[in-house]
Each structure stands twice: as C-alpha cells, then as structure tokens.
C-alpha cells in the first residue's frame, strides 16, 4: 500500500512526465534524470517507440529457453518476409500494454497486465524485447517481439513492464479485499432485511423503499463498482479512488480467473518473471532515460533486422 500511495503522490506532482515517449529518436522534450523518476509515471503510462517484429504461439507461460526459441522463430519469419518493420508505440501502465501504429495512430493491441505472464530482453538478439500473454479470445499463449534501438532500451521496457505488474498486483490484492468486505456487508444486510420481513407484515412498497435506502447508502460509499456485463473481456477498468487515498480496481470474472491461473505458473505470484539477471536489473535501474537514446559505443546504430 505504501508503494501505491507513493506512486500516486508522485504522479500528482509530475503528471506531464507520462506523456513523454522514449526511443523515438529525439521526439521527447525533457526526460527524467533517473529511473526512479520515470518509474513514478507508471500510473498514467510510459511510452516507448519500437518496431514490431511479430507474434508466435508458445506452449508455456514463461521460460528463458522458451522465449528465446519463440523470438528466434519470429525474427526468422520477419527476415524472410523482407518487409519493413511496423513502427509502433508501446504504452505501459498497470492497466497493461497498449500497442498503436505510429503512422496511423490506430490501435493494434490492448493487452491487460493481468494476462501477461513473462517478459524479457533477449540475450541472443540483444535489441529485442518480448512478452508472453494469454490471448483474450481463448487460452492460447502468444509471444510478441519488438525491435528496440539498443539493448539498454530492451532492458528498460522489460523493467517497466515488471514494475507495472508489481503495482497492478497490489491493486488486485486491494480489490479482492474490498470485494470480500462488500460481499460480507451485502450478505449481512440481506439477513437483516429478511428478518424484518419475517417479523413485520410489510407491503411491497415498504420493501421497495427499503431497497432504495440501501441503494442510497451504496451510492454514498467511497468505492464505485464496475459493471461485470462488459462485452470486452480485456477491458481493464479504471482505478477507483477511496477515502483512504488508496486505489482499487474491479476485475471482471474472466480477467480475475486468467490472472489467478497465470499466478500459479510464476516463481513468485507477486512478481512478473523476466529474463533479466540481477546484474541486468541493477544496470537498467541505474540508467537514465536520456541514455536510452544515446548511440552505442560500438558505432553507428542500425535498427534494421539484418543488424543482428
């Protein structure tokens, strides 16, 4: 909860930071001085300009060897096609990953954070970022890969997704607790109403009045719920503000089930598995976003497929 409050306060202090985009070859205006400042903008979303390599199906929700093999297939397919890679913007937040086309600004993909089971900066193709997520249409697992300008960018995106997942998990925990409290209160309220009906011969109008009073009390409650009748199973609800300066998200049953199932596959249910080593994580955390756009010391960068 302390992490949520801290992130919320940081976002209020600097909401404009979330509008910036990294990896776009100088499109940004001013970047945070360190990774901590960047991390604080997650609630609204961080933008990364990448190139989409493609997607392939995988059999398991996580694994370094599994993702490496999937990325190898994706890269081989992209090379064989001979087509220019699609330039995209990746927006990462605790809600998930939103993928849009840079030229048309058209939405390509909107993946709930609760469906993502793994992300990595590939070791063989060191400028590739990839994530594995459960399809919103069925239970198949998809590996999506993206070409970054350099390895440090791929590491930064991976770290951002992992951090977004951590915040989202805390939202989920709070949401579950609040839902249990509401269900318990609702059950107790129903028991009281039933007892009144048993002992008092009331008219239907009196029962209706009692229901209206219950609705008024519900409307005054600090938590507002999201309808579970949504037609989009991957539509991630907006966080609802609570009187205690906390944030709660309501999940539909489909997302809740998917998140719970994927949690069983993780090494630690509270942490998104990544392909980053402890050294990689430390290096990425020490980076300034300004460094992400600097050319590598090896010379002029080429961002086409054949520079691997």
From Swiss-Prot:
SUPFAM superfamilies attached to this UniProt entry: PH domain-like
Disease per UniProt entry: Hypercholesterolemia, familial, 4: A form of hypercholesterolemia, a disorder of lipoprotein metabolism characterized by elevated serum low-density lipoprotein (LDL) cholesterol levels, which result in excess deposition of cholesterol in tissues and leads to xanthelasma, xanthomas, accelerated atherosclerosis and increased risk of premature coronary heart disease. FHCL4 inheritance is autosomal recessive.
Clathrin box (motif): residue ranges: 212-216
The organism's taxonomic lineage, starting at the top: Eukaryota, Metazoa, Chordata, Craniata, Vertebrata
Domain notes: The [DE]-X(1,2)-F-X-X-[FL]-X-X-X-R motif mediates interaction the AP-2 complex subunit AP2B1.
Pfam families associated with the record: PID (PF00640)
UniProt tissue specificity: Expressed at high levels in the kidney, liver, and placenta, with lower levels detectable in brain, heart, muscle, colon, spleen, intestine, lung, and leukocytes.
Modified positions (N-acetylmethionine) in chain numbering: 1
GO cellular component: axon; basal plasma membrane; clathrin-coated endocytic vesicle membrane; cytoplasmic side of plasma membrane; cytosol; early endosome; neurofilament; plasma membrane
Organism: Homo sapiens
Quaternary structure annotation from Swiss-Prot or TrEMBL: Interacts (via PID domain) with LDLR (via NPXY motif). Binds to soluble clathrin trimers. Interacts with AP2B1; the interaction mediates the association with the AP-2 complex. Interacts with VLDLR. Interacts with LRP2.
One GO molecular-function entry: AP-1 adaptor complex binding
The keyword Lipid metabolism belongs to this UniProt entry's keyword annotation: yes
Biological-process GO terms, alphabetical: amyloid precursor protein metabolic process; cellular response to cytokine stimulus; cholesterol homeostasis; cholesterol metabolic process; cholesterol transport; low-density lipoprotein particle clearance; positive regulation of cholesterol metabolic process; positive regulation of low-density lipoprotein particle clearance
UniProt name for this protein: Low density lipoprotein receptor adapter protein 1
Major location (coarse): cytoplasm
